[in-house]
Amino acid sequence: MHIVTSTDILLPRAEDMGAWSVIACDQFTSEPEYWAAAEARAAEKPSTLSLMLPEAWLHTARADGADGRIADTMRRYLAEGVFQTVPDSFIYVERTLSDGRVRRGLVAALDLEQYDF
């Protein structure tokens, strides 16, 4: 096997991408109102918010049992067909920075047993 390879990619079937997507969990750590608004937007809809623990919640009661809830949600999303599978794929990403430069990236599978840095 190669160190970097294609893999089956799971993409959301979500009709409301505003509810599905949230910013990275390490952002807005001192702004709980952002996360409250994200929760309200997601409500009972499938959301990546249900698949992570925002750092803003790390030292709160919300962190208690979060790993189990997240794992349960992952299993439920798989069972309910929340995702569509794009087989044997890579994802190419472009992001334009505030200064106009473009960063490019590739999402791929990485065989950590083969990788040596």
Feature locations, PLM:
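A cross-family signal for N-terminal binding/gating loops and helix N-caps
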Residues: M1-D116
